[in-house]
Design a protein with these regions (language model features):
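Cyclophilin-like peptidyl-prolyl cis-trans isomerases
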Residues: 2-3, 10-16, 20, 24, ...
Length: 239
């Protein structure tokens, strides 16, 4: 499972997204992933330095998330391009505003409000599931805005339903999407079809793969952990 950790620790606070479509909102969290094999041993820092010359030192420090309330959603729903400027290079996400309209509206809103700026990506996994998880400014996997959004565009079928390059929302259960998301960098992920699929990486997937290849500190009980090669979102914007 890829998710956030806060939901179990805080009482839900209901808010309403006023739209043509209305939905319930609450505080959200990000709990880690489900059954994975024990991750590979993390690589030494010297290997990280040698392996990722593309990455600059990051000045991003985990901090308290902005307590943004839900945006007022207005049609039309459109596709967006969300750009993440990281210390390792630029990652562009083609956001599917047609099939995941409320999610994309929210991510567009958060990006342009500066919510993601200077936020460390807090988890990478390299066995069982293959993801880089970001979107919590605290860098701990507990943070999010003051609202959640419903699930949308859940994949159907089985097998490789989240192919490499897919971008999906982390959650702590049904309809608890907040700000945390993950980028799948390798096919054949063993993810269940319960994560809102809202975009695909069209530029910079090689950055995610390179960071993942450096391993993690294996600090997450569910698998993976903090990337050995730090990667942070220094600036995010949406068009």
């Amino acid at each position: 499972m890829i998710g956030d950790k806060t939901q179990m620790m805080r009482a839900k606070r209901a808010i309403t997204f006023t739209v043509v479509v209305a939905f319930g909102l609450s505080l959200f969290a990000a709990a880690p992933a489900s059954a994975e094999k024990k991750p590979k041993v993390a690589k030494k820092s010297s290997q990280v330095t040698k392996g990722l010359a593309i990455c600059k030192p990051t000045k991003a420090v985990g901090h308290k998330p902005m307590r943004l309330t839900a945006p007022i959603v207005k049609k039309p729903f459109v596709n967006r391009t969300i750009t993440l400027i990281t210390n390792c290079g630029e990652i562009q996400i083609e956001a599917d505003g047609i099939n995941a309209p409320l999610t994309v509206y929210s991510m567009n809103y958060l990006a342009n409000k500066g919510f993601f700026d200077n936020s460390p990506c807090h988890r990478v996994t390299n066995q069982g599931i293959f993801v880089l998880q970001c979107g919590d400014p605290s860098g701990k996997g507990f943070g999010g805005p003051a609202y959640t959004a419903p699930d949308e565009n859940l994949p159907e079928g089985s097998g490789n339903i989240y192919p490499a390059g897919s971008v999906a929302m982390a959650n702590s259960g049904p309809n608890t999407n907040g700000s945390q998301f993950f980028i799948i960098y390798e096919d054949n992920s063993r993810l269940e079809a319960k994560y809102t699929l809202w975009g695909k990486v069209v530029k910079g997937l090689e950055i995610v793969k390179a960071v993942a290849a450096m391993g993690s500190d294996n600090s997450n009980p569910a698998g993976g952990g903090i990337p050995n090669q730090p990667i942070s979102i220094e600036k995010a914007f949406s068009r």
